[in-house]
Every structure is written in structure tokens, then in C-alpha cells.
């Protein structure tokens, strides 16, 4: 493993502003090859060029982007929007449903969003899974939740909802509250039907039940197996101990987080973000509030940026400590997990003193944070983290990472290269373990990360061992960032002085009746955001997390798209684990570092 210190300044993206990005290099390349008349460029606050095109052109454009000298190698996200109730669609193609494809070019450090308009009577698109294999699950999700078909898809079935589910929940005409449904009744007939739906039928997945000489075993790992790390089911096709193939089965933890975003105000949705990746705490608030602040045009004070960075890195450390302890436990060592949980308690002591809560503080606000740092917070950080954890990390390395059993179980196991990682949408430590230095905090700095001195740990082999090694070193780098926050915390307010800051600064409400009225409206009814689209990605605990928000000029989001890293990481499992042993699968699952709420949302 190596550390990267220097980063080319020309790769750091400028502050994202409302723009149509017509000057982007890729726009010129598309116009030159296909003709400008075949595209519509949308002006957004996403910071990304947004290009509308017809479905007939989609596959040709995808193939073209894949073959450019600096190609777009990752399908970062794929989802859809029900446009039928949207009021503010000025100068956009006529569309009832819109499918969008978010692509990333690593060589350019650039993004591109493609949008395809569809009419309600003809909701069909060609699959792009032959260009991007990770489109498989994303297209299944779009069909499941929006009802859009993808011709040529290898297995277009439900992925979040049960097989027996009626309707497509993310459509605007689908109820958003449980009270709008008839009472649920589980009689004997329905129970038998649901149990039959859960039976795995190999033929449906193109799997043989055996070869000429023997039958294969089909084994359910989960959804309640301790090594599955949550409500996650893997159906394994086994030839003895060898895994010939497997089918991941997700959705058991699905709670409709994106649908909830359509029924909560911009302010009251913040606690819901905490639960998307329940180990990340305020790390989940960050991309959401940054995206909302782009909509509102809010620039937060420097003190707010640094407070947010410090809290985000505290949660990164406690999440990585949980990973280290449970990963070593998966390999067979029991003792380290108790030490890592003890160390996590020290970090929670800091978090609770600052925010008032532990795992789910919901502490970030639109335009700032909930309140200022408490008196004596520096001593808490020093005593419970900076003076304690460095030595403990050395102990973990000696006891675990240099342990011959762990090394034997992990080195060379479940390895993949950078090209494969990008093809499956892998981000975070799982991508950097392959040798690629791609950390959003460095490549696309947000919240003032460009002001901090830290290095990006990078592996070399892309195996289960390197994925653990990278995360241990990331803990050290997070401590460096926190120490800089402690020494350089600027003075100033903890909220922006902006009309859409929610809640508004308290001292203003005590002097100005108009501000008090604004406070009442924004907290009870909710702030009204300008009609626009915004996007923000961050380097979260498990990989890149992002929020893509569509405002229709209301107190609530018209469409809240949450892209989580773990969804992509679990889709990659079959391609990595085929031909390996069941024991290797357990190690691989532990090395991914996922929680099912991050997958299922």
C-alpha cells in the first residue's frame, strides 16, 4: 500500500454554479459526432452537463462515450423521474417519465448526465447492460419502482419490492402514506403464496440444477446469517465447497427513503438521511444539506465547513473501527471486536458532547449546524481520540493485519482490478485498494477539504487484505484532519445569514418580528426552494454517496434520488466470487464493508 500526497491542482473541480456547461469538452465531442440538433442541453445547479437525447440515440451515444480517448468508464447512477405533476419544465423536451444516466470519466475527472424522455403509453428503453454491467440492478430498480421496461435486460424482475407487490411505488399516483392503503391481512392463502415466492428456482436465473454426474447444492446464506451483515440473502450454487454461481437477493431493509423525501419538508427530511447508512451519522446529512444549499444559493461560514468536516471524519473513524473489529471476527478472531467497540465508545463520547446524540444526531442544518461547539470540546477530542487511538491502531495491525491466519485467509482472495471495479461502479476503499487514487475529498473537494493536509491510502492488489489495509490507514488520515480542525477552528457564526437558512439564527428572531414569522413558516411549513435541480457527491464511509434533488418551487422535494455505494458493491459479488470457496465468500463479504440500509434505502 502507498500514500499519495500531491494532487494536480488542475484536477480539482471549480465551485459548482448554475450552468448549462455547453463549454464542456464532452458536449463539443457529442455535437461534432452526432450533430447539435439531436440534443437538448439543460441548465441546472448540478455542476454536471445534462444532455437530453432520444431513446433511438441512446446506445450509440453510450458506445461513443465508452470509446473516447478519455472514456466515460463508470455508470455512477441510473434512475428515473415521474414528470407528470411537475410544473417548472421550461424549455425541456416533452416527457411523462425521464430516465437519467450519470456517467463518470476518471481520466477527465468529469461527469455527464444523459436524460431520455418517455411518454406514459410507451415506457420502454433498450438496456445499456452490454456497455455497463452494473446497469443490471439499476434497470431492475427503475422497473420495480417506476414501471419502465428495458428491452434485452437479462432478468427484469423486482429487486426492492416482493414479487407479489402491486404497482410501482415511486410513481406520483402511488400512495405515499400507509393510511392510504387498505389494512394488510395475511391469511393462509397469501402466506403460502409469499412462501412460494421466496423459493429459489434456478431455471429462472439460467442456472443448471446439476451436471451429467451429480446435482449441485443450492444454499441460502441469509437473510439472517451473521456473516451476511444484515438482512441480506445470497443463494449459492455449489459444487462441493466451490461456488459455481450466486444470486444476491436484497430489498429486505427497503423503507422507501426516496419516497419519503416527497412528503417531508426540506428541513424535516434531515433525520431520514441519518438512517440511510446508519453507521455514518451526520456523514449522511452532508450531501443532502450541501445539495439543498446549492438550490438555495447559500454559502456557509468557514466555521460551519470545518465543524462539518470534523464531525464527518469522527463518524468515518467509528465506522471504520466497526469494520476492523467485525472483519477480524469474520476471519475467526474474537478478541479485537471488543477492543474496537471500546474505542468507538470514546468517539461516541465526543459526538454526544457536541451534538447531543450518538448514532443518529441529525445535527447538520440547511445553512449551518444545529448549535455551536460546546466549551471544552478540544480537550474531549484530544483525550478520547488523538492521544489514544494512534497506539491502538498499531496494536490492531500487530494483532490482526500481521496475523498469519488472517493473511492466509485474505491475501489474494476476492481480488479484482481497477477496470473491473469501475465497470461495476465500485467506489471508496474497494476502488482505491486496486491502486486507483480516486477520493472525492481530493478530486472534487467540498466543505473546504482542499484546505486540509492529508494523504489518500491506495492499495495494489485489490484483494480482501488490501481493502482492510486501506481502511486502517484511512483512520490515521482522518485523525490528521480532525487534529487540524482542532488547531485551526475559525471564529464566526454556526449558521449562514441567508433567508433560507433553516432554522434561522435565533438571535434575529428576538429582535425582528419578520424574522420570527420566517422562523415559524420555515420550521412548521418548510422553506420554499427555487425550482431547479442540484447534485452533491461526497466521500462517505462506504464509498461515494450522493443526492440528486429536483425542486419544483415547493416546500418539499419533487424527486430525491439517493445514490449509495453499497448497492453497487453487492451487485459485484457474483463476478468476483465465482470459482472460489464458501469460506472465501465470508471473507469477501466482510471486506466490502456494507450495511443493508445503505443498499436498500
UniProtKB/Swiss-Prot annotation:
Q: What is its main location?
A: membrane
Protein name listed in UniProt:
NADH-quinone oxidoreductase subunit C/D
**What superkingdom heads the lineage?**
Bacteria
The UniProt keywords, alphabetically, are: Cell inner membrane, Cell membrane, Membrane, Multifunctional enzyme, NAD, Quinone, Translocase, Transport, Ubiquinone
The family database entries (Pfam families) matched by this protein are listed as:
Complex1_30kDa (PF00329), Complex1_49kDa (PF00346)
GO CC, any one term? plasma membrane
Q: Which gene underlies this protein? A: nuoC
Q: Segment NADH dehydrogenase I subunit C: which positions? A: 1-191
